[in-house]
């Protein structure tokens, strides 16, 4: 791994379960969820919260486990955070069986006790979770979908698959940590003297697919004051807060819904599905606003071989995200990612919104690898995608110009990406001198930090020099033509 790669990406943590989702819950805390499902493999189904702190030895962030909480029989496939205060929030999560579970999550101190943290902490986690966390068991049973995912994972981890690993291995990290004992001792690796308590508040069914009910998505909107669910049965659930009252189950699509997102104003909801449709819904009256047509704007490939495939290929919308335009919270755009089942390029489409009308503004190729995850920074400046091959790409949202690329950050497809807060305090944790930072997760059990370097500028001296040269050029030109 090159020095440049180390500066751009680093391994925050390696866990002992597949990770399916990640959320940033404060300027210095991230929450992950996942697990092995109901399969009797000994793999738990937990939430974990990590504290990010600045490490002066490596000039980047380090992650320390603050809380481990096992939810029981079912893996956490998706989640959303409903904040009450800085360290008090409700957590909606779900997956198999089409169930949604609501947890109250509260911050508290451990009586001031701080103990040394060890990398091999699975036994300590189980003991601490039984002492500090309140847990309620749920009797839910479904196994087929989890087993399918595990077969997919085993296929990717098989001996015939060769993976180029650009990240620090555990031995590399151990070697670096022992290079300078004094420096290592100056940054003690300790468990925080606080914890987050998880308390199950309620559970309810959101998906009613006849064969395999599966809640695939759960999203929260502050301005709409609602939580929205979607999954295998093609319906979108509108749940009013604070009591999670079901307002309606909208039959939005004929097939499984792959993604939904909510307009920052809380007026519109975008949904994309395996039925090939990208739809915009009015949240207030549950009516269809418009259908986005992508097929007409996808450019034809110039390669003859790809052109023959393109003729019969079908592009499906896979991901969608609303975003504010940088510097203007009243100006919103929508990004939609398109994948093809054939070996063709994937695309990112940008739609502008004017008076509730959607107009295609730009479309770019994101390479010939399917896109699996998407995130946008809170200031609207950057858009990130995670790919089937484990790659992470970041684009400038305004121009859709790629500004960061890290190949095979994970050994398998990316399941989740999340930008850290763009506040100064949060960026200082990763070493500063960056425009943004994001964290990616996968079923390869790894949490990886990516740092987006500041874009090069001329600076004051460079701008002054450019101005002087420009004036000199004008003078010489005018003198040459006797003007």
Predicted regions and their residues:
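Beta-propeller domains
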Residues: 2-12, 33-69, 106-120, 158, ...
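Juxtamembrane amphipathic/hinge helix adjacent to a transmembrane helix
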Residues: 395-397, 405-458
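C-terminal single-pass membrane-anchor helix
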Residues: 454-483
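Conserved strand-to-loop turn within each blade of WD40 beta-propeller repeats
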Residues: 34-36, 43, 94-97, 230-233, ...
């Amino acid at each position: 791994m090159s020095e440049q790669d180390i500066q751009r990406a680093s391994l925050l943590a390696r866990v002992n379960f597949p990770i399916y989702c990640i959320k940033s819950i404060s300027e210095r805390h991230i929450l992950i969820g996942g697990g092995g499902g109901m399969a009797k493999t000994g793999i738990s189904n937990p939430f974990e919260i990590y504290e990010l702190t600045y490490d002066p030895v490596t000039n980047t962030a380090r992650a320390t486990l603050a809380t481990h909480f096992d939810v029981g029989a079912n893996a956490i496939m998706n989640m959303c955070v409903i904040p009450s205060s800085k360290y008090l929030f409700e957590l909606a999560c779900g997956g198999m069986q089409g169930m949604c579970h609501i947890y109250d999550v509260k911050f508290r101190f451990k009586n001031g006790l701080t103990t040394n943290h060890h990398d091999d902490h699975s036994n300590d986690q189980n003991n601490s979770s039984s002492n500090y966390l309140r847990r309620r068991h749920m009797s839910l049973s479904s196994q087929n979908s989890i087993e399918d995912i595990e077969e997919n994972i085993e296929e990717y981890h098989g001996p015939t698959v060769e993976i180029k690993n650009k990240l620090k291995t555990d031995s590399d990290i151990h070697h670096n940590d022992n290079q300078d004992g004094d420096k290592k001792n100056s940054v003690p690796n300790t468990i925080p003297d606080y914890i987050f308590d998880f308390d199950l508040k309620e559970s309810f069914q959101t998906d009613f697919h006849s064969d395999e009910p599966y809640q695939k998505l759960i999203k929260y909107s502050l301005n709409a004051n609602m939580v929205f669910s979607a999954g295998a049965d093609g319906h979108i659930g509108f749940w009013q807060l604070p009591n999670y009252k079901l307002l309606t189950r909208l039959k939005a699509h004929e097939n499984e819904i792959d993604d939904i997102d909510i307009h920052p104003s809380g007026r519109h909801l975008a949904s994309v599905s395996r039925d090939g449709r990208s739809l915009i819904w009015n949240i207030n009256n549950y009516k269809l606003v418009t259908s986005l047509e992508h097929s007409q704007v996808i450019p034809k490939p110039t390669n003859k071989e790809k052109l023959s495939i393109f003729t019969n290929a079908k592009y499906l919308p896979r991901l969608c995200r609303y975003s504010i335009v940088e510097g203007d919270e009243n100006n919103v755009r929508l990004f939609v990612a398109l994948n093809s089942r054939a070996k063709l390029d994937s695309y990112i489409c940008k739609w502008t919104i004017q008076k509730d009308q959607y107009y295609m503004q730009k479309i770019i190729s994101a390479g010939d690898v399917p896109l699996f995850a998407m995130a946008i920074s809170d200031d609207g400046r950057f858009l990130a995608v995670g790919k089937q091959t484990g790659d992470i790409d970041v684009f400038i949202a305004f121009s859709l110009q790629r500004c960061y690329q890290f190949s095979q950050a994970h050994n398998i497809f990316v399941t989740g990406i999340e930008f850290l807060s763009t506040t100064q305090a949060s960026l200082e944790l990763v070493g500063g001198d960056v425009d943004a930072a994001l964290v990616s997760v996968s079923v390869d059990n790894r949490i990886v930090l990516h740092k987006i370097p500041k874009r090069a500028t001329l600076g004051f001296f460079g701008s002054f020099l450019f101005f002087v040269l420009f004036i000199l050029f004008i003078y010489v030109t005018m003198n040459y033509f006797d003007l």
